[in-house]
Amino acid sequence: MTLKFVKGESDNLELAKGRAAFVLVIGNTKTANIEGITVAGANPELIKYTPPADAELLYHGKCLSIDGVPATPDGKPTPALITYTALRLTSIPLFVVNSGLMVPPKIPYIDLNAPVGENIAESRAMDREKVEEVLERAKIVGRQLSKLSDVLIIGESIPAGTTTAAAVLKALGLNAAVSSSMPENPVELKRKVVERAVERVESNDPIEVLSAVGDPVMVGVAGIALGSEKPVILAGGTQMVAIANLIARMGEVEAVIATTKYVASDATADLSLSPFPVIASDPMLGKSRYPGLRAYEEGFVKEGVGAGGMTSVAYARGITPEKFLEEVEKDYERIVL
């Protein structure tokens, strides 16, 4: 399997052969401060730098906010590396959107003036009025960017995003099955956080759910997708499943979720909860000569920063899986080693 639909069918990927734009929405939630909830950073202090560093890597092929690249505590590299290779090979334009960052990136970006998300284990995530304002601003961004392309590809980077995604799914009355950046998904810890968080949800109205248990990146992605006048590829895993369920309750969007096979084969995740078709791509990292890349096949990291979506687009544009892996390894050698 290099590319296959795991739910439904869609022509959106075909559109990516024409004019496409990649939009990376980045932000932070203080939920990432809960010990053991995420490994999206080499240590707790560095977690807040992961989203801006991911965005910098996509533009420059190196990070400016931190030394090296975002990695797990034992050195497994950010999925931004895969997205970087795909963007380089396809020449698709990149736009970065700040939706609630703690640390702004050292690159040009669009700012939605979104709040940082609060720790959903302790309080409501965001002020409802703020969420509504950010959503409207994001719709404007989506509308304008969609004029440049036949399809908008939207990715995300937010540590602890799978935890807020689980809370959103639960608050919407769905099974809170989400993936993790670790092979041993801290399911029990997430479940406790989610149970505590959903007690604050007053209704299953999507804006209320977002405000109570979501995160600012969800607001940005949902708004951009809702504002787009063209079809959308939601480039991500279970976080995009949660966002897709919010979007489907807020308006009409022609969308498909594109993720990696590592999420699709994760027993703790449930992509069938998506209201839109889902396609999974295999970046072939299991065949890599580098342990840091093979780790993806072993259940580490899995997805993020639009990696699965951009791999799918690269394949749709005729880049062979063998060539793609070769180029990812070249970038890994230059950027990581």
Curated annotation (Swiss-Prot):
Example of a GO MF term: nicotinate-nucleotide-dimethylbenzimidazole phosphoribosyltransferase activity
Domain of life from the UniProt record: Archaea
Cleavable signal peptide: none
UniProt family annotation: Belongs to the UPF0284 family.
HAMAP family: UPF0284 (MF_01086)
Protein name (database record): UPF0284 protein AF_0276
Species, as recorded: Archaeoglobus fulgidus (strain ATCC 49558 / DSM 4304 / JCM 9628 / NBRC 100126 / VC-16)
Lineage, broadest ranks: Archaea, Methanobacteriati, Methanobacteriota, Archaeoglobi, Archaeoglobales
